[in-house]
């Protein structure tokens, strides 16, 4: 005998289901659930008098070795490039084990995930689950960036640096084997996944190759060290040999050539361009046109995301500090001014919305804010909906109902998850909510989505959480703030975080030589990438910049946006 209950009551008990919509934070973005893998009337819920008890929703006979998961997140809404759906998510051995319907098959049909005595439960009802974010533009200036990033849902940090040295404050580079070794050892105490860039500036192969063999996952070419065509070509030769990525910050002053010369030096080889709009650095005024090439994986940094009435004004001072410039030297001021163009910044948000710019990142403490990658990505999505209206898949493929924002949500979630992972050769391990992936996951209350997570899970264990006073009688009394949890302590940290290395470094025995105890994974599959491999962000139109007005056109049509006066996900969330 079936029993019907009102949809609102069902959502209160078990969370919303297929066809229901959820507002994300205080934005104008609405998520619609496309599929529900749970079974109506057979939902598993934990608590007093609830379903997950021995002999009911929990099987009391099977051991952990008999496919019993370590953790099940129940009835959670997944927002991922793979889809927007509701399911039970099982974690085992630090990985996503199964996605489907949890319960006890002895009493329930259609069970994919068997809950047992070895299983912990995280209640996902009325919550949203995303993959842990990946920030591919990290200046490792301060280790305090790590908790700031985790508190916004970032679980992987890729970049370079040695601390607050001038080279690091300006460039994402860990130069040479000695510094790479020390930073890999320092990463042993950081509860995030780590990958390091070496210095991509040499006129011979071996000074670059030795950094890859020392453990770098790629090389960074940066104008402050000289973004010359020879450095670009030599770095790409080494990258092709070792299957690593080259990240590039091109020549703002056009001293070594123009954007066309850089494109010729790249010569069709895959490359990851940083702050491709140009305010963060790059050929003035038209580096942005490189985003239309099929071998370029273009990223933005968050100082210019989203475009607001304050964006232009705040950039000059940031630039002077980050690039060791002197405000008393007219040439230094002119250099800074040349990078800040309202017209190209106004086009940047639109290029993200069109799927031309593919990745968002921070540029941490070097103009960007490491704890705002997720927030600012969704602020751009909201601004674009307000200014450009609904966004639908040009292929005509369905993504929920016509009223939902599902296609736009998949495009934007991909920018700091799967696409960042693909660009760095990490996508077989992290970057999405898929079976077999490392269990780096973020749980959000929809009202706080993109701003403050409820839980951050690293390698299957809770690393950070919204937690109340530790001396209180329950976990929820104010002040509730993001605090470190057990995955960040002791040896658990090393078993829940990954250090990415080149395959050459692993083959050379670097982990044993340095005494590394963390999980070690190689980057791979990079040199055969094209922009078409990026999810929901693979467009390659013709982009042009008027050399006099700086107006940007895409396939001959001008693209621009208006600066926002007010943003969602902002002051009302940060009163305390």
From Swiss-Prot:
SUPFAM superfamilies: Composite domain of metallo-dependent hydrolases (SSF51338), Metallo-dependent hydrolases (SSF51556). The active site is at 323 (proton donor). CDD domains: Urease_alpha. Its cofactor is Ni cation. Gene3D superfamilies: Metal-dependent hydrolases, Urease, subunit C, domain 1. Carboxylation allows a single lysine to coordinate two nickel ions. The keyword Plastid does not apply. It holds the Pfam family Amidohydro_1. Pathway: Nitrogen metabolism; urea degradation; CO(2) and NH(3) from urea (urease route): step 1/1. Substrate binds at residue 222. PROSITE patterns: UREASE_1, UREASE_2, UREASE_3. One of its GO terms (biological process) is urea catabolic process. It is found in: Cytoplasm. Binds 2 nickel ions per subunit. Heterotrimer of UreA (gamma), UreB (beta) and UreC (alpha) subunits. Three heterotrimers associate to form the active enzyme. NCBIfam families: PRK13207.1, urease_alph. Belongs to the metallo-dependent hydrolases superfamily. Urease alpha subunit family. This is Urease subunit alpha. It comes from Paenarthrobacter aurescens (strain TC1).
